[in-house]
Amino acid sequence: MYRTAKGEEIFVIDGHTHFWDGSPANQKNIHGKQFIECFYAYHSNLSPPSEKWEKEKFEKYDAKTMFEDLFVTGYDDMAILQPTYLTDFYKNGFNTTERNSAMKKTHPDRFILNGAFDPRDGNKGLEDLHALSEKHKLKGVKLYTAEWRGESKGYKLSDKASYKYLEAAQKLGIKNIHVHKGPTIIPLNRDAFDVADVDDVATSFQDLNFIVEHCGLPRLDDFCWIATQETNVYAGLAVALPFIHSRPG
C-alpha cells in the first residue's frame, strides 16, 4: 500500500516482475552469460548507488528476497509475474511460467501468474498454450519477439503464425497480451523488438489489450503514435521509470 503525503492509501498492483535464474549453473552457453551481464549493467547504471546489488545476488533472484522486496520493504500489494523463457540460453529457462508458479503457489493472494507462447512452436505450442491456460487459469501472457529459437532470431506479431496464437488466446479468455518492446539485451537483435507490429494486431484483435512493456524504448515516438491511434494499446513503464531518476531533464 502506498500512502500519499495527504494520507490517501493507494492499492498497488505491480505490473511487471520477474523471478529469474541467470546464474552460471543455469547458463547453457556464452549467450546466457552475455544476457545476464547486460541485464546487470542496466541495473547498475539505472539504480541509485544505495540500491545496487552485488552481481552474484542479482544473477539469481531468490524467493525470500523477492517477497520482501515487493511486499515488505516495497509498496506492492500484488504483483504480476511475467515469464521470459530464453531456453536457447539457459538450461532451465531464465524465468519460466513453471518457476513463477512456485511463487504463486506459496503466496496465492499476492501474485497474478501470466503465461507465454511462441508462434514458432507450431501446433505443439498451441496445445501447450491450451494446457497452460487450463492449469493456471491465465488472463495474460508475456511475449518476447526477439527471443532466439534455433536459427530464428525473432518473429513478428503480424506473422500468420502469431495470428493463430492470438486467436487461440482470445478463445481461451486470455485478454492481456504483454509484449516486450524495449531496450535490447545482448545478444538479442534490436530490430526484433520493433514496436511497429503492435499496430497491426491491435487493429485486428479489438477484444485484446496489448500492453507494450517498456513503452517501445528506444522507439518511444513510434509507440506514442500507435497508442494514440489504437484504444487497446497501453504502456508498461518498467525500465522507462528509472530514466526519470537518471535523466530528469
Predicted stretch roles:
Residues 1-249:
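Helix-coil boundary/capping segments in enzymes
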